């Protein structure tokens, strides 16, 4: 039973390694430049950079607190 378990685990490992070997890889310098370019192109749509208009902000209180 143990031998068949080991064989099954080895086959799974080999299959996983084949999948990982088939992944296309690129250099970090190219990936980082592409990421920076993407961020620059989409910066105007990023709510963390440009903010959310008060009229569209679902978390802004509609009316002030009466207690204060």
From Swiss-Prot:
Disulfide bonds: none annotated. The modification Blocked amino end (Ser) is found at residue 2. SUPFAM superfamilies: Transducin (heterotrimeric G protein), gamma chain. Expressed in a variety of tissues. The modification Cysteine methyl ester is found at residue 65. Its main location: membrane. A lipid is attached at residue 65 (S-geranylgeranyl cysteine). GO terms for cellular component: heterotrimeric G-protein complex; synapse. It is found in: Cell membrane. InterPro entries: G-protein_gamma-like_dom, GGL_sf, Gprotein-gamma. Ser-2 is probably acetylated. Keywords: Acetylation, Cell membrane, Lipoprotein, Membrane, Methylation, Prenylation, Transducer. The modification N-acetylserine is found at residue 2. Pfam families: G-gamma. One of its GO terms (biological process) is locomotory behavior. Residues 66-68 form a propeptide. SMART domains: G_gamma, GGL. It is a lipid-anchor. One of its GO terms (molecular function) is G-protein beta-subunit binding. Guanine nucleotide-binding proteins (G proteins) are involved as a modulator or transducer in various transmembrane signaling systems. The beta and gamma chains are required for the GTPase activity, for replacement of GDP by GTP, and for G protein-effector interaction. Plays a role in the regulation of adenylyl cyclase signaling in certain regions of the brain. Plays a role in the formation or stabilization of a G protein heterotrimer (G(olf) subunit alpha-beta-gamma-7) that is required for adenylyl cyclase activity in the striatum. Belongs to the G protein gamma family. G proteins are composed of 3 units, alpha, beta and gamma. This is Guanine nucleotide-binding protein G(I)/G(S)/G(O) subunit gamma-7. It comes from Bos taurus. The lineage of its organism: Eukaryota, Metazoa, Chordata, Craniata, Vertebrata.
């Amino acid at each position: 039973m143990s031998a068949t378990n080991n064989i099954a685990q080895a086959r799974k490992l080999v299959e996983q390694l084949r999948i990982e070997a088939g992944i296309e890889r690129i250099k970090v310098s190219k990936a980082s430049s592409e990421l920076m370019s993407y961020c620059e192109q989409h910066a105007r749509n990023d709510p963390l950079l440009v903010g959310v208009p008060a009229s569209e902000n679902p978390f802004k209180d509609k009316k002030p607190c009466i207690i204060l």
